[in-house]
Design a protein with these regions (language model features):
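Amphipathic alpha-helical dimerization/coiled-coil segments
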Residues: 2, 90-115
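Canonical helix-turn-helix DNA-binding module
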Residues: 42-78
């Protein structure tokens, strides 16, 4: 029997920082864009509500891993765009290595060649 989608919540907690940093590596983004992109790329399995996403972005900014800046565009509301800092890139590289090691270990235990 397959687990319901809420089972992804525990995995999301551990991987949220990695997901956000990975998306910001590609280009600066605002919170709503990050939320929708994660949902779309995960086919709806992962969803970040603003009550989860923005506190995470504020913590990352406070730790010097991302930098936020306000951007105003014509006929649009002001949005805060976040970009990865040099320290954020270093942490992202470490987290990716760690994640790959974790996935490999899980695959070996479960007897699967590829996760």
């Amino acid at each position: 029997m397959e687990e319901p989608n809420h089972s992804h919540q525990e995995w999301k907690k551990g991987g949220a920082e990695l997901l956000i940093l990975s998306l910001l590596e590609q280009q600066p983004r605002h919170g709503y864009d990050l939320s929708k992109l994660i949902e779309a790329r995960s086919a709806g399995a992962l969803r970040f509500h603003v009550t989860t996403l923005y506190p995470l972005l504020y913590r990352l900014e406070g730790r010097g891993l991302v930098q936020g800046r306000w951007v105003e565009k014509a006929n649009q509301r002001r949005r805060r765009y976040y970009s990865l800092t040099a320290e954020g890139r270093k942490l992202l590289a470490r987290q990716r290595r760690s994640w790959r090691g974790f996935v490999e270990a899980m695959s070996q235990v479960m007897g699967e060649e590829h996760a």
